[in-house]
Structure formats: C-alpha cells, structure tokens
C-alpha cells in the first residue's frame, strides 16, 4: 500500500475556511480528479460534508470517511473510526488522503508522496496544510518551474510534487 496526500493551499498554507475551500479553481479540481480517479480516497467527516451533494460520493473512487461518531452512516461511503482502520480496510491499493487538517497530520508520517496546488491568493482561514520539512521531503516537480499559471478564474496557481526522502 502507498499513502499519498493531496491538497490545495494558499501561499501561506491555508487549506480551509469555515468548513470550505476559500477559492474556486477548476484546474485544481481537474488535477485532483486525474490523480485520484480509480483509487480510494480517505477524508474526515467535515471534509465529506464540505463536498457538494452532487459529488458525494466522489465518482470513480472508493470513499472512506473517518468519524468518531459511533454508528454514523453516510450514503455512498464507508465510515471507519480511524486512519488505521481505513488503511486496513483498503488493503494494498494506492490510497489518497484528501483532508482535512487533522487527517493530514495523522497521515503525513505514513505518506510517501504529496501533491500540492499552491494558490497565489491571500485568504483568511482556520485550517492549514502540514509543513513539508526539507530534510524529510524532496520536491520532484513544479509546474510551472518558475512563476504561476493563471486560472480561468484569474487566480494564480502552480502544482508541486513531493516524495519522501
């Protein structure tokens, strides 16, 4: 099994605000789909609830939701109590962890790959991406190499890929 993490963050690390994502970036959504399609995704309950209903469950992916609420059932997803339970349930597949902040913190020590979209906006937030210390993580790709793409929404962004050293 391999554990990969994926998130979009502002330049100062914000990934969430008020239970949602503080930007709309179709290019990031397309990349997320391309990377995770056909693989299981693991998320916390709040992340699940932040998804628009029409995307619950995320199509083409086994959806696993972490929740401390005993007996919680969500249509189209499997609910487990912990990240360890999720990984045991999923077996040998590549698993994508997609949030939120607490789940990223739990999964980061197990991860071998992180895919990041850096969004060039300043936003207020209440949830941050974990740090990727340079002695533990190596950037393997940046698109573009220098500077930013401009999204269809006039938002600057770039894609970064990291692997564990």
Go through each PLM region and give its residues:
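Enzymes that bind and transform nitrogen-containing heteroaromatic metabolites
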Residues: 1-165
């Amino acid at each position: 099994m391999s554990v990969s993490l994926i998130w979009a963050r502002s330049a100062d690390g914000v990934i969430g605000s008020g239970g949602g994502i503080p930007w709309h970036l179709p290019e990031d959504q397309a990349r997320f789909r391309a990377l995770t399609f056909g693989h299981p995704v693991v998320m916390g309950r709040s992340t699940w609830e932040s998804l628009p209903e029409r995307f619950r469950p995320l199509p083409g992916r086994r959806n696993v939701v972490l929740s401390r609420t005993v007996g919680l059932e969500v249509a189209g997803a499997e609910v487990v109590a912990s990240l360890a339970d999720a990984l045991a349930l999923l077996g040998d597949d590549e698993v994508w962890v997609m949030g939120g902040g607490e789940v990223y913190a739990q999964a980061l020590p197990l991860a071998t790959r992180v895919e990041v979209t850096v969004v060039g906006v300043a936003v207020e937030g209440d949830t941050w991406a974990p740090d990727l210390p340079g002695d533990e993580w190596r950037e393997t790709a940046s698109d573009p190499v220098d500077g930013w793409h401009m999204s269809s929404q006039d938002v600057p962004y770039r894609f970064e890929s990291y692997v564990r050293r």
